[in-house]
Amino acid sequence: MRSSLVAAVVLFLTLPVLGQGGGVTADGWQARLDSSRGDVNELSFMSMSDGFHVTTGPHAIFWNSANTGSGTYTASATFMQTKPSSHPNSYGLFIGGRDLDGDGQAYTYFLIRESGEFLVKKRMGGDTEDVTPGWASHAAVNGLENGQQRNTLSVEVGASNVRFLSNGTEVASVPKAGLSVDGIAGVRFSH
């Protein structure tokens, strides 16, 4: 049986303004920064009527432990960037999250950026590895238009492959072996 999680979540991304932040205020959600030198209060992740509003800061993942998947499943979210950035920021989904607040953290992530490019990577502890060969352009990834960007990202975990889709179109498909796929699903923002 195929299940779906993180469905119909709309995230609104804005860029940081000095003094903004406040950390994670959405009920049930947690965050982890890539760097131990960062401060979660430099960013903002809060509930709003249609989903969540995120103001980026340090590179971070956000998750709710209730959003888990195993076997075959789909994780999906719609992202809207509301302001252009002065440099390449990225955001997207992660799946297979394990030990997210520990030294053995592991997950697979699918990111896009306003240039219309995508990237798939995996994290194992403090190390990351490209799953796809670097940032790549794809017509299915909407770029910035009139200062905004909107994309629905999905990760479909099948019996032997994992498909990464933007707006319903596959941008990559890779073997499931070697990826972290069973576990928590959430979102990632890189600034």
Place the predicted regions along the sequence by residue.
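Short, aromatic/His-centered strand-loop micro-motif at the edge of beta-sheets
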Residues: 126-152
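Flexible glycan-contacting loops in extracellular carbohydrate-active proteins
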Residues: 174-191
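Extracellular carbohydrate-recognition regions
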Residues: 20-41
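N-terminal signal peptide c-region/cleavage motif recognized by signal peptidases
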Residues: 14-16
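Beta-strand-rich interaction surfaces with strong enrichment in secreted/lumenal proteins
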Residues: 60-68, 138-145, 187
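Carbohydrate-binding surfaces in secreted/extracellular proteins
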Residues: 77, 145-175
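Secretory/extracellular carbohydrate-interaction modules
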Residues: 56-128
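Short carbohydrate-recognition loop motifs
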Residues: 41-61
